Amino acid sequence: MFDRLPALRIFLAESRLGWVPFWLEEADYWYERHRHWAARLLDLKPLAQRPSDYVRQHIYFSVQHVERVAIELRQHVGVAHIMFATDFPHIECDWPNTRPFAERLFAGLPPDDAFSIAAGNTLEFFGLGDTPMGRRVRSAAPR
């Protein structure tokens, strides 16, 4: 699908992120292990890339306050593909304590990574960077 639609981007909201690095490794392993017989016996065409490459190029994930491990594993997915979420207005949302939760989540991160995950990636994904709110948020970005 991604070879036919190279500009396709998918955002998995409320999916969490901590499981993704393990899943990427597993997907590549099992694809490599079975692709030869699947092509031969089932006439399935081989992928142009590894499954993990498609995910890293096309899939975006949300991360919430309790996912410090996911933040520490961010390079496995790519910082540009991670967006902070509060899950408002659901019962498990961070509000009204979003700021302290976010501060704990992003503690020790390079400021550029923290800004990208907290706001920048969302502005980019949804095309909000040139809106009045987007410009205001970007003005707070680390320099």
Task: Give residue spans per PLM region.
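Mid-to-C-terminal alpha-helical segments outside catalytic/metal-binding sites
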Residues: 8, 18-19, 38-41, 47, ...
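Aromatic-lined glycan-binding groove of carbohydrate-active enzymes
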Residues: 4-52, 56
